């Protein structure tokens, strides 16, 4: 197993056990430079409670969570009874949707896997502002600001979260330490499995706020964790995006970094 290299700065960003200190690894910047991308990658190793990033300043800067918010939204839906259980089917009303893969009946896992925005907008509407606000405070999720509409505050409203806060939230979920039932946390964790390789298991979720412009770019996310043998690695990546053709980079850049660290891949 390779170790994180070229750590040059230590900064206290949080009081939590996982991200109490984070180190800057400038060697990762070559992956961003190669694609002419502005972004950040935070990678934390559970056993050593150590974290690294290519950009200390951006690691703590908050952005729209976009569809990464489906993770807490699903837990809140289960906790409030809006989602009955993991077997509940969300019926398609037959009306055209932005993506063809959303135009069908979906289970919770299916809705997460295809990132079905209409399903989670309906969940949020049924949860309502009061309960939504209560749970975001319980979860210490981002700036906890749900202004901008109950069914879009995470897409174009005022909710913001940093890459560091993302990994903190994911660690709490992994350890079943969120203020939610263990059963509901397990349901969502299972729904987040995106890769099951012989040597490792990836739980993850992407997010995309839209492309924006060159002067005011959107944000693209990939967050999650990797279980490998007895180790767990939590990660959060975000990048500025002004052209949809760059969207695959939200996964390819962090994948290359994790491959170079010996976490995933061959």
From Swiss-Prot:
Its EC number is 3.5.2.6. The keyword Methyltransferase does not apply. One of its GO terms (cellular component) is periplasmic space. Disulfide bonds join 44-51. Residues 1-19 form the signal peptide. PROSITE patterns: BETA_LACTAMASE_D. Activated, with respect to most beta-lactam substrates, in the presence of 0.05 M sodium bicarbonate. One of its GO terms (biological process) is antibiotic catabolic process. Changing residue 117 to L: Slightly increases catalytic efficiency, about 4-fold, with respect to carbapenems. Decreases catalytic efficiency, about 10-fold, with respect to some cephalosporins, but about 80-fold, with respect to cefotaxime. InterPro entries: Bact_Transpept/Beta-Lactamase, Beta-lactam/transpept-like, Beta-lactam_class-D_AS, PCN-bd_Tpept. It is found in: Periplasm. It holds the Pfam family Transpeptidase. NCBIfam families: bla_class_D_main (NF012161), blaOXA-10_like (NF000386). Dimer. Class D beta-lactamase which confers resistance to the beta-lactam antibiotics, including penicillin, carbenicillin and oxacillin, and also some cephalosporins. Confers weak resistance to some carbapenems, in E.coli strain C600Z1. Acts via hydrolysis of the beta-lactam ring. Has penicillin- and cephalosporin-hydrolyzing activities. This is Beta-lactamase OXA-10. The gene is OXA-10.
């Amino acid at each position: 197993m390779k170790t994180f290299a070229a750590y040059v700065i230590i900064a206290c960003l949080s009081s939590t056990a996982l991200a109490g200190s984070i180190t800057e690894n400038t060697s990762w910047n070559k992956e961003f430079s190669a694609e002419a991308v502005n972004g950040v990658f935070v990678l934390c190793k559970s056993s050593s409670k150590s974290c690294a990033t290519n950009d200390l300043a951006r690691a703590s800067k908050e952005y729209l969570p976009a569809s990464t918010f489906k993770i807490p939204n699903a837990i809140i839906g289960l906790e409030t009874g809006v989602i009955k259980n993991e077997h509940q089917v969300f019926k398609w009303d037959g009306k055209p949707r932005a993506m063809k893969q959303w135009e069908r009946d979906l289970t919770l896992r299916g809705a997460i896997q295809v990132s079905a925005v209409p399903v989670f907008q309906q969940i949020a509407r049924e949860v309502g502002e009061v309960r939504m606000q209560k749970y975001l405070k319980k979860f210490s999720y981002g700036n906890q600001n749900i202004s901008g509409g109950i069914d879009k505050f995470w897409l174009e409203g005022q909710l913001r979260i940093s890459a560091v806060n993302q990994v903190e939230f994911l660690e709490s979920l992994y350890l079943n330490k969120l203020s939610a039932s263990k059963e509901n946390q397990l349901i969502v964790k299972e729904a987040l499995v995106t890769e099951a390789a012989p040597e490792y298991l990836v739980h993850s979720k992407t997010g995309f706020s839209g492309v924006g412009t060159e002067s005011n770019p959107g944000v693209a996310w990939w967050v999650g964790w990797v279980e490998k043998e007895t180790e767990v690695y939590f990660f959060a990546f975000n990048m500025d995006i002004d052209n949809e053709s760059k969207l695959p980079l939200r996964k390819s850049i962090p994948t290359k970094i994790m491959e170079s660290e010996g976490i995933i891949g061959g």
